[in-house]
Amino acid sequence: MRCLPVLIILLLLTASAPGVVVLPKTEDDVPMSSVYGNGKSILRGILRNGVCCGYKLCHPC
């Protein structure tokens, strides 16, 4: 009978524990969506400002 409370406590603890091992994020863990969004905003800025071909001739897109 002494084992029953211990067994119940262990069952409650294992049920509330996360099923996946959670690792802390490092600086190398960059989500792909932010990389894609940064590239998109850079391209949008280039296209909005116009493209210069190296000479004095610049044309907007």
Curated annotation (Swiss-Prot):
InterPro entries according to UniProt: T-conotoxin
Molecular function in Gene Ontology: toxin activity
Compartmental location: Secreted
Signal sequence annotation: 1-19
Expression (tissue specificity): Expressed by the venom duct.
Entry text on domains: The cysteine framework is X (CC-CX[hydroxyPro]C).
Name of the molecule in the record: Chi-conotoxin MrIA
